[in-house]
Regions:
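Bacterial N-terminal signal peptides
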Residues: 1-9
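Intrinsically disordered, low-complexity terminal tails/loops enriched in metal-binding residues
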Residues: 8-139
Length: 139
C-alpha cells in the first residue's frame, strides 16, 4: 500500500515537472518567434531545475537548457532551443504523453526540428519574423 502511494506521489510530481517544462518551452518558443530573448534565460533555468528533478530520463533536456542559459546571440539560442525541443518531445514520447490541452507539436522543415506551441497559426521560433509561418503541426 505504501509503495502504491509513493508511486502515485512521484508520478504526480513528474507530471507537474513535465507540465512546467512544457509551459516554459512554449514561452521560449513565443519569444524566439518574435525575435526576442526576453526571459529566455530565466525560462531555460526553470526548465533545467525541473529536468534535473526528473533525473536521467530528462538529462538531455537539462543539458540543452544549460546551453540556452549560456547563449547570448539569438542564433545560438535558437540552436540550443532545437536541442531542447527535440529532447522534450522525445521525453514526452517516451512517457506516452501529449503536450497538453491547447498545445501542439510543430516541425520546421528547414531545420527539421520540433517545438511545442499553442494551437493556432504556426509561429516558427527557429526563423522568427524571417519565416514566421514556416512549419506544420505533427499529426
Amino acid at each position: 500500500m505504501c509503495a502504491l502511494i509513493l508511486a502515485a506521489f512521484f508520478a504526480g510530481a513528474a507530471a507537474d515537472a513535465t507540465e512546467l517544462m512544457i509551459n516554459q518551452a512554449v514561452a521560449i518558443a513565443t519569444s524566439l518567434a518574435h525575435d526576442k530573448l526576453d526571459d529566455v534565460a530565466t525560462n531555460a533555468a526553470a526548465i533545467d531545475l525541473e529536468a534535473t528533478s526528473l533525473g536521467k530520463p530528462a538529462a538531455k533536456i537539462s543539458s540543452a537548457a544549460k546551453e540556452m542559459q549560456k547563449s547570448a546571440k539569438i542564433a545560438d539560442v535558437r540552436n540550443a532551443f532545437g536541442k531542447l525541443s527535440e529532447a522534450l518531445v522525445g521525453y514526452l514520447d517516451a512517457q506516452k504523453r501529449k503536450p497538453g490541452a491547447g498545445l501542439k507539436v510543430a516541425v520546421c522543415p528547414m531545420v527539421d526540428k520540433p517545438w511545442i506551441q499553442k494551437d493556432g497559426p504556426i509561429q516558427n521560433p527557429y526563423y522568427g519574423s524571417e519565416m514566421l509561418g514556416c512549419g506544420s503541426f505533427k499529426k
